[in-house]
Amino acid sequence: MEDLCQYLLVALPVVCFLVWLWRDSQRVPNITEKYVLITGCDSGFGNLLCKRLDRRGFRVLAACMTERGADDVRRAAGPNLRTALLDVTDSASIQKALEWATKEVGDTGLWGLVNNAGRSLPMGPTEWMKPSDFESTLRVNMTGVIAMTLAFLPLLKKGRGRVVNVASVLGRVAANGGGYCISKFAVESFSDCLRRDIHYFGVKVCIIEPGFFKTAVTNLESLERELHRLWNQLTPEVRDSYGEKYLLNYIKVQRFILNLVCDSDLSKVTSCMEHALTASHPRTRYSAGWDAKIGWIPLSYAPAWVVDCALNLVLPRPARSVS
């Protein structure tokens, strides 16, 4: 009896893992008949994803912020890809995109909505921000995701499809001030609530949590320019409490971190998105990038004091620090 128990203790995890692998490998049929709408296709993850899905035979509805971005997508696409201009912060633009998508998909419904559009800046010390600095990011990353999802849910319910929301590892660990981390935490919680509410209608919800990748979101020149703008808008009292050396060291730290961990292989993220759209049993969360898997995600389970200490070791100290 004791030998049997020991055998079961070893065999059960192995069997569970094999079952998980089998379920994870199952794919949905007839992808050439499925419509997927992707936001933020001008560059980065969205641009690569729409081209990859188009090559696989999906009917891609690529939503771009600019005409230039839409032209770039069309030049590299096949005959089944369609483009439209979309500003996720503008309700009229969302309504126009909904009417366009409704005509495109017809009675088929929408198989996938990939909420990829996003912005990261301004990002920096919290005290340097104004409310408008938070709002500009939250309108795209949080309110835009919510507005798009609610608008397209009827089409998704008709197609029994799935919502793929792009969050971030910074939706697990708040490492910077500004609206970015706040918005990505919001995407995580919104997606969890939506998944629990909407599964009754056959709609699945997946969260993509990329680590640091070389995209417009992690552009060093833009980050440094925004940090200088924030610094210049500070009152003399606040500026004096930090000291100009703090600004210079803060920029050095950001430059060092981004150069160290940013991955240029965007396909690590788009592969997760593709799995979420093609798997019969998509995962709830996908972590993309080595820094996410061995760094940020494990750190998110650590006590708050561990995270605080880790970040304090990296970030500079203000000139008039009292602790």
Please place each PLM-identified region on the residue numbering.
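Conserved glycine-rich cofactor-binding loop
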Residues: 35, 42-43
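SDR active-site lid
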Residues: 200-283
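Residue(s) in the substrate-gating loop at a strand-loop-helix junction
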Residues: 168
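Conserved NAD(P)H cofactor-binding loop of Rossmann-fold oxidoreductase domains
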Residues: 116-122
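Substrate-binding pocket helix/loop in short-chain dehydrogenase/reductase
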Residues: 124-126, 133-135
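Active-site helix of classical SDR
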Residues: 149, 183-186
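The beta1-alpha1 cofactor-binding region of Rossmann-like NAD(H)/NADP(H)-dependent oxidoreductases
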Residues: 86-99, 131
